[in-house]
């Protein structure tokens, strides 16, 4: 069985070196081309999908659409869920990473970005950019909508969707595409690859590159490769 992950193409804020998180920014021109190229690679390699899962953030949705369009599979059903959203970077969202490092120190920012269980500064729920004020999350209980997350909390958010939707689809023989974000995919990779809390700090998933897992019947990773 094979499973394909793709991190969204380079976003406008990626290009500006800003913390993005749950802020809904668009793909950059380069990101659009990355997503299209990913679709072409998947088509050339003969990948066909039965279902696609993505987040409720524009950059991932557009990446999913472009990948499917370029591979002549735009008709494939898509399920969008907040559980596949990027990690919520709290009060860091919208800040320039270099400026944050200058203020707080390189090591502190590295820990906020890459550690498994250290939380970033909290975003005030009354902030105009808080997810509490975004109607795409209006159906969720207020205490479920995050104000900041680390990778541990992100995994706790993502894992129920893996267990309830993605894993059963794979076990049913469906060919699955997951178009999401650097940290939601890192969380899933940690789970399916059995990566330790320490080693996950070093895992980087590049934008717009299809990551193909070969899984056994128990959804354990046999191999992985980038196209």
From Swiss-Prot:
The keyword NAD does not apply. It comes from Mannheimia succiniciproducens (strain KCTC 0769BP / MBEL55E). Substrate binds at residues 7-14, 20-21, 59, 86-89, 97, 113-114, 182-183. PANTHER family: PHOSPHOGLYCERATE MUTASE (PTHR11931). It comes from the Bacteria. InterPro entries: His_Pase_superF_clade-1, His_PPase_superfam, Phosphogly_mut1. It catalyses: (2R)-2-phosphoglycerate = (2R)-3-phosphoglycerate. This is 2,3-bisphosphoglycerate-dependent phosphoglycerate mutase. GO terms for biological process: gluconeogenesis; glycolytic process. Pathway: Carbohydrate degradation; glycolysis; pyruvate from D-glyceraldehyde 3-phosphate: step 3/5. SUPFAM superfamilies: Phosphoglycerate mutase-like. Homodimer. Its EC number is 5.4.2.11. The gene is gpmA. The active site is at residues 8, 86. Belongs to the phosphoglycerate mutase family. BPG-dependent PGAM subfamily.
């Amino acid at each position: 069985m094979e499973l394909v992950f793709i991190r969204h193409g380079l976003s406008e804020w990626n290009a500006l070196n800003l913390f993005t998180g749950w802020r809904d920014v668009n793909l950059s021109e380069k990101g659009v081309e990355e997503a299209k190229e990913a679709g072409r690679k998947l088509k050339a390699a003969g990948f066909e999908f039965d279902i696609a899962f993505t987040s409720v953030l524009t950059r991932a949705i557009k990446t999913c659409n472009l990948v499917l369009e370029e591979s002549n599979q735009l008709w494939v059903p898509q399920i969008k869920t907040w559980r596949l959203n990027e990690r919520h970077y709290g009060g860091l969202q919208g800040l320039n990473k270099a400026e944050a490092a200058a203020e707080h120190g390189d090591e502190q920012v590295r820990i906020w970005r890459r550690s498994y269980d250290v939380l970033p500064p909290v975003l005030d729920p009354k902030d105009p950019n808080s997810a509490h004020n975004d109607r795409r999350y209006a159906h969720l209980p207020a205490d479920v909508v995050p104000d900041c997350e680390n990778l541990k909390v992100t995994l706790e958010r993502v894992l129920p969707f893996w267990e309830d939707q993605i894993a059963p689809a794979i076990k049913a023989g469906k060919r699955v595409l997951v178009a999401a974000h650097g940290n939601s995919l890192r969380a899933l990779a940690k789970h399916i690859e059995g990566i330790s809390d320490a080693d996950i700090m070093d895992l980087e998933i590049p934008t717009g590159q299809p990551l193909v897992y070969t899984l056994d019947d128990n959804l354990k990773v046999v191999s992985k490769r980038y196209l």
